[in-house]
Amino acid sequence: ALMLQGVDLLADAVAVTMGPKGRTVIIEQSWGSPKLVQDVANNTNEEAGDGTTTATVLARGANPVEIRRGVMLAVDAVIAELKKTLNDELEIIEGMKFDRGYISPYFINTSKCEFQDAYVLLSEKKISSVQSIVPALEIANAHRKPLVIIAEDVDGEALSTLVLNRVGLQVVAVKAPGFGDNRKNQLKDMAIATGGAVFGEEGLNLNLEDVQAHDLGKIQEITEQLDITTSEYEKEKVTDALNATRAAVEEGIVLGGGCALLRIGIEIIKR
C-alpha cells in the first residue's frame, strides 16, 4: 500500500504536465524520490530521449501486456497512415567552439550575443584605430549582415566606435583564443571553416583598410557569452536534446504536441 501511495504521488504530479497544454509542477524534495517509477522514467528517457511523462503514467496502473496488444493491433494501420506524409530529411551543420567571450557587455542582444548569417573578420593583430575597421563595417552594413570581429584584441577608438555603432549595426568583438603560435593556428582553423582570410598573417599582404567582401568569413549562426556557467537544469536540457536527436536520426520523428496521435486516432476509428 505504501509503495502504491508513492507511485500515485509521483504519477499524479507528473500526469498534469502531459501534452501541449501541460501545467508546471513544483515539488519540494524533503525525502527520497519514488525510485521504482523514477527508474521507469529514466530508462525511457535514455532509450527514446522523451516520453518520461507517458511512461510514468503507464507505470502507475496500466497493464503493459494489454497496451502492447492494443499497439500491435493498430501498428500496421498507423505506419501506413504516417507513411503518406513521410519525408527523409537529415541536415548536419559543422561548427566550432572556443573559450573566449565578447570584449564588452554592450555587445549583447539577449542574455548572450547571438547572430545569424554573419560576416567574420579575423586578425592576428590588435585593432585600435577606427580607420582599420571602417571598411569592414561598411561592407557588413551594405550587405545587411552582422559582423563578428575576432582579433588579438580590440581597444581604444576602435572599440568605442563598435560600441557606438551597435545601435545601427549588429557587431561584436571577440578576443582570439590561445597565445602565440596556438592562437595563429586557431585563427587559421577559423579561416578555413568560414572561408575567410586572416589579416596580419605572415606571408599574406592583407591590410584591414583594404578588406573586400570575399576576405570576410561567413557563418550561419554564432553565440557569444561573457563566460560559461553550466547548471544542472541546462545539463538536463542538453541531455534530453541529445537523446531526442539520436532517436530522431535512428527512427525519425512525428508532429509533436499530440498532433500525430490525434490524426492517427481519427484514422483508426474510421477503420
Swiss-Prot record:
| Ligand binding (ATP) | 50-54, 257
SUPFAM superfamilies (alphabetical): GroEL apical domain-like, GroEL equatorial domain-like
Listed PROSITE patterns: CHAPERONINS_CPN60 (PS00296)
Found, by tissue, as follows: Detected at higher levels in caput epididymal spermatazoa than in cauda epididymal spermatazoa (at protein level).
Give the EC number(s) under which this enzyme is classified. Answer: 5.6.1.7
Which UniProt keywords are given for this protein, alphabetically ordered?
Answer: Acetylation, ATP-binding, Chaperone, Isomerase, Mitochondrion, Nucleotide-binding, Phosphoprotein
Give the main location: mitochondrion
Where in or outside the cell is it found? Answer: Mitochondrion matrix
Query: What GO molecular function annotation could you give as one example from this UniProt entry?
Result: ATP-dependent protein folding chaperone
Phosphoserine: residues bearing it: 30, 33
Reactions the enzyme catalyzes: ATP + H2O + a folded polypeptide = ADP + phosphate + an unfolded polypeptide
Domain of life, per lineage: Eukaryota
Q: Does the keyword Phosphoprotein apply?
A: yes
Q: Which GO terms describe its cellular component?
A: cytoplasm; mitochondrial matrix; protein-containing complex
Q: Which GO terms describe its biological process?
A: protein refolding
> Which residues form each disulfide bond in the chain?
none
Modified residues annotated as N6-acetyllysine in this record? 83-84, 97, 112, 125-126, 145, 188, 237, 270
Q: Which residues carry this modification: N6-succinyllysine?
A: 84, 97, 112, 126, 175
PANTHER family, sorted? 60 KDA HEAT SHOCK PROTEIN, MITOCHONDRIAL
What protein family is recorded?
Belongs to the chaperonin (HSP60) family.
Q: What biological function has been recorded for the protein in this entry?
A: Chaperonin implicated in mitochondrial protein import and macromolecular assembly. Together with Hsp10, facilitates the correct folding of imported proteins. May also prevent misfolding and promote the refolding and proper assembly of unfolded polypeptides generated under stress conditions in the mitochondrial matrix. The functional units of these chaperonins consist of heptameric rings of the large subunit Hsp60, which function as a back-to-back double ring.
Quaternary structure (record): Homoheptamer arranged in a ring structure. The functional units of these chaperonins consist of heptameric rings of the large subunit Hsp60, which function as a back-to-back double ring. Interacts with 2 heptameric Hsp10 rings to form the symmetrical football complex. Interacts with HRAS. Interacts with ATAD3A. Interacts with ETFBKMT and EEF1AKMT3. Interacts with MFHAS1.
What this protein is called in its record is 60 kDa heat shock protein, mitochondrial
Give the organism the record lists: Mesocricetus auratus
